[in-house]
Amino acid sequence: MSRPSRVLGLPLLSLGLTLLVSTPLQAQEAQTFRAVKQDLVKLYQSHPSTFYCGCNIKFSGKKMAPDWESCGYLPRKQANRAARIEWEHVVPAWEFGHQLQCWQEGGRKNCGKSAEFNKMEGDMHNLFPAIGEVNGDRANYRFSDWNGKPNQYGKCQMLVDFKEQRVQPPKGPVRGQIARAYLYMGEQYGLRLAAQQRKLFEAWDRQYPADRWECERNRRIGKLQGNTNPFIEKQCQ
């Protein structure tokens, strides 16, 4: 009877190890946009600064609010929305969602049933804290650089061209982070990027390398989510 028990034990041991090894990946796949917000709030308590405008972030429990005075921000039109922090998808949900069958059959709401969409929507490498008004104004517009003069949000250097549906982000680290988020999402999920957009992001990636915070953020998200952004990783070694 001892031999059969050893034979049965090996598959059971193998199964146990498989489950143990698979747990982080399964946890990653189970993450949703709603769930990861809690981890992101904790993450940014050590770096309380908004994306795009660089305003200080004030914390009250789980709630976050921008400090306009810290960055000279002035609302363009929607003061109420500008008073809160929203989690910005640098690669918009429409951009990675509309390529999926679920979106084509019923839009974003229908994609809520898709594990593939939920994984992309909840990928923390693509999520950044932004002033709500700026997040709303950016919408699904493409990033660009036409040497426009920012004048819509006080001292914030973000510029939105509503007529041409394009956005000029501030020069500096933000552009590098945008580029590496796009390049990552393209490689990680097979998203198709227009040749002109890819060329722009590759240029920004070279021009604005990862700083200390971007490296730290990447490392900590890697622990939370189970994978790092290789476009950041190679610049942090």
Curated annotation (Swiss-Prot):
Disulfide bonds: none annotated. Keywords: Endonuclease, Hydrolase, Nuclease, Periplasm, Signal. It is found in: Periplasm. One of its GO terms (molecular function) is endonuclease activity. It holds the Pfam family Endonuclease_1. The keyword Hydrolase applies. InterPro entries: Endonuclease-I (IPR007346), His-Me_finger_sf (IPR044925). Residues 1-27 form the signal peptide. The keyword Signal applies. Endonuclease which is capable of degrading plasmid DNA. This is Periplasmic deoxyribonuclease. It comes from Aeromonas hydrophila. The lineage of its organism: Bacteria, Pseudomonadati, Pseudomonadota, Gammaproteobacteria, Aeromonadales. The gene is dnsH.
